[in-house]
Amino acid sequence: SPTEQPYSSAAPLI
């Protein structure tokens, strides 16, 4: 997971 959210969420890849 990018941050703590699911991969398909609005979380950035970095």
Swiss-Prot record:
Cellular component per GO, a single term: chloroplast thylakoid
Q: Which Cys pairs does UniProt list as disulfide-bonded?
A: none
Q: What is the lineage of its organism?
A: Eukaryota, Viridiplantae, Streptophyta, Embryophyta, Tracheophyta
Segment forming the signal sequence: none
Protein name as annotated: Unknown protein from spot 115 of 2D-PAGE of thylakoid
Q: Origin, by domain of life?
A: Eukaryota
The answer, when asked if Chloroplast is one of the entry's keywords, is yes
The note filed under miscellaneous reads:
On the 2D-gel the determined pI of this protein is: 5.5, its MW is: 27.4 kDa.
- Provide the alphabetized UniProt keywords: Chloroplast, Plastid, Thylakoid
Q: Where is this gene product found? A: Plastid, Chloroplast thylakoid
